[in-house]
């Protein structure tokens, strides 16, 4: 890394430590030319896969769209914001763990349903009714029966 003071190419790392729950590395560096010290932070560049919609259109993963869908299902339910954010982080981790550059929306939807099932059964049924396009009350009953198994 170039020195921010004299633009020299050679710097050495004096100290490294994990910060932000281990998601960042803080490094103290010293320039070998001017001896000035400075701090850098290193984070992994985590790229989420693109999403393939049902009409084969590809678009970047949209975390805000995911959050809106989950919050709509969880409206007026006793689930904390922290629990929702944890679920969103878990879904993103699962998507990254696929190692794929593109994933179908069906996979994202199924991950959301799994997360909602753990968070709140009513929210799960709300989301499933829209996601799976329930046509009548019988389909609601069948899904509720599956939840009780």
From Swiss-Prot:
Which domain of life does the UniProt lineage start with? Answer: Bacteria
Q: Which gene encodes it?
A: nrdR
Q: Which PROSITE patterns match?
A: ATP_CONE
GO molecular function terms listed in the Swiss-Prot or TrEMBL record: ATP binding; DNA binding; zinc ion binding
- Give all residue intervals belonging to the ATP-cone domain: 49-139
The lineage, from the top, is:
Bacteria, Pseudomonadati, Pseudomonadota, Gammaproteobacteria, Enterobacterales
The Swiss-Prot or TrEMBL record lists the needed cofactor(s) as: Zn(2+)
NCBIfam families given for it?
A: transcriptional regulator NrdR (TIGR00244)
Entry protein name: Transcriptional repressor NrdR
- Pfam families in the record: ATP-cone, Zn_ribbon_NrdR
